[in-house]
C-alpha cells in the first residue's frame, strides 16, 4: 500500500519576529519534505501561525492594538521571512482560520461525551488592580527548579511544566502587583484515565522507534511521574469559546487548541483532508519540534486524539531539536543581540548560505552556539572550497578543454563503486531525519570528487592521456549532477542553478542517482558563491552583538537591574550556631510561606532581642553557601561608614508596616516588567555599588524604593556610607 508523508513543523507564535533559532524546525521540515517529494512519496508539508492565547493578548496590549490586528501583522512578517528562506510549505495557514473553532470544539465535545472531561473548582490568581483572573502566562515569577524568570505555564530556561502557584514571588504581568488566589471553575482533561491507552500506543514498536532519544526519555520520565488532570480552559477573551453552559466567558487554553491547528489548517485548504489525518494505514506522520514542545506532541496531543475515540493518524516520526543560541548571548531584539529573520535578509548573504550553515550545525543532540567566525569558516571551507569548488573546476575544465557537448560516458566502475553505496546511506539518514549527518556525508562525497580530480592532475595529463581524462571529467560531471540532487533539500536555489548549467529541465529525483545519462551539454558555468570576507563578518558581528549597549549594561544601575534581587524579609526566629557562637542563624519570612534562613556574623553588633520581629533586606538571589555546616540562603544588607560603623538596614525606618516578600527596585523602574535574576555570587552584588547618601539608599544617584508602596529605602543610622 502506498505510503504518504504528512509533515508538520511546530506552529510558531505569531506575536514576534522569528530569530535564527526559531527557524530550525521549519527549515528541518522543509529539507525532509523536499527529500520526500524527490523520493516519489506523496507529501504534504503543513505549518501555520499559532494565534490564540495569552502571549498574543499581552503583546496586543503592549502594541496598543487588537489581537487580530496583531496576528495579521505578524503573520505577514513570518510569511515573508519563510519565503525568503525558500521554505516550500504545501500549506502555511493560521489558527484563526474558519475551520479551527469548529474542529477544536468538536474535539472537546467528543472528549466530554467519552467521559474524559472533568469540572473543577480551583483557586486561580486574580489581580485586584486589573480585576481579572490571570491566565498562566499572565503570571510571572521565579522558577522553583532553576530560579530563572518564568511564566506560569512553563519555564523557558529549563523547560519544566509549571502551574502559576508553583512560581516563587508571583506577580501580575500587567501591573506587577502580587495577585491573590480566588476560586473559579475550570474544565480539565482526565489524562490519568487515558494513560493506559497512551502507554500502550507509545510502547507499540511502530510508534516510538523513530523518535529522538531525548524525546523518548523526556516522555517516559513524564509518564513515570504520573499523569495529572490538566486544565483546558482559561479566563481570557482571545481564544476559542468553550461550548458549555456556564463557560461562556472562558476560552480553551492554547496548549489544547494549538496542536489541533495542524488538522484545521489542512482542513481549510485540502478537500480530502481525512485521507491525511484519518489514515493510519497509509500516512506516516512526521513532526518537527523544539525540545520545549516534546510533551505537547508525545503526551497532550495524542491524549486528545485517543480520547476522541476516532481513527486519527498518529505520530510515527518525531524529530526534536535542541536550542540554537547566539554567541553565548540571548536572542533579544530590544538589546540588539542575535540575528532575526528580517535582519538576515539585509545581510547580503544568500539564503542558501544561511540554510547550509543551519543544517550543518542543526542542534540534533545538544544545543549549538551560532558564532559569526564559525559561519565564515564553515561556509568558506565546506560550502565553497569543497562543494562549490568541485562544481566550478570540473565544469570549467570540461567547457575549456573538451567543449560544451557531453559525449556518451564510459563508466569508471572503480570510481562509482566507492560512491554508489554512500547514496543509500545518505537516503537512509534523510529517511530517519538525521539531516546534519546526511549533509556531512554528502560533503564527504564532494571532498572525494575533489581528491579524484586533484590526484589525476587533468591539467597536466589532458595532452598525454586525453581519453582517460575526458572519461574522468564526464564521470565527475554526473557526480556533480547527483550532488545537485542530494543537496537540493538543503540549498535548493543552488541545486537548481547547477542543473541550469546542463540546460536540462530540473531532474530532482532520487531514482536517477547513479545513472550516467541525461546530460547533453554544458550551457554555461559561473561561480556559485562568493567567499565571506572577514571585514563583513566583523561588521555583522558588531552590529548584532549588542555591544552598542554594553557600556550602558555595565552601569551599576543596570547591573543591579539585571543581576541583583533585593527583598524584604521578617526575622521570625534567631538561633546561634553551636559551632560558632558569633554566627546568628536568622529564620525568615519572605512572603512565600516557605522557611528561609541566612547565617550572619552579628555578635558584638546586635543582640537577638534587637532584631527579632524586624524587617530587613536580603540579597535573595545569592547562591546558597554553608557557614560552619549551616546553610545560608542569602545575605542581609547593611550600611558602613568611613569609620567602620556598621548598621543593618531596618525597613521599619522606611515604612510603618513593611510587607515580607516585597521587592526593592530602582525608582525609575516603576511599572516595568522586571526579570527575576539568576543566582549570583557576592562579587556581582558588590558591582552594583549601592551607597547611602543623605540617609537614602542609592545607585548612581537613583533611589532604591519598595516596589509596591514606592517608599524610599532609608538608612537613618548611617546616612552616608557604602552598602555591604
UniProtKB/Swiss-Prot annotation:
Chain sites annotated for binding ATP: 333
Binding site for Zn(2+): 143, 146, 155, 158
Locus of motif 'KMSKS' region: 330-334
Major location (coarse): cytoplasm
Enzyme type, top EC level: ligase
EC number: 6.1.1.10
Domain tRNA-binding: 560-665
Cofactor-binding details, from the entry: Binds 1 zinc ion per subunit.
Protein's name according to its UniProt entry: Methionine--tRNA ligase
Function: Is required not only for elongation of protein synthesis but also for the initiation of all mRNA translation through initiator tRNA(fMet) aminoacylation.
Gene Ontology molecular function: ATP binding; metal ion binding; methionine-tRNA ligase activity; tRNA binding
Protein's gene: metG
A Pfam family of this chain: tRNA-synt_1g
Family: Belongs to the class-I aminoacyl-tRNA synthetase family. MetG type 1 subfamily.
GO cellular component terms, semicolon-separated: aminoacyl-tRNA synthetase multienzyme complex; cytosol
Stored PANTHER family: METHIONINE--TRNA LIGASE, METHIONINE--TRNA LIGASE, CYTOPLASMIC
GTP-binding recorded as keyword: no
Location of this chain's protein in the cell: Cytoplasm
Quaternary structure, from the entry: Homodimer.
Known catalytic reactions: tRNA(Met) + L-methionine + ATP = L-methionyl-tRNA(Met) + AMP + diphosphate
Listed cofactors: Zn(2+)
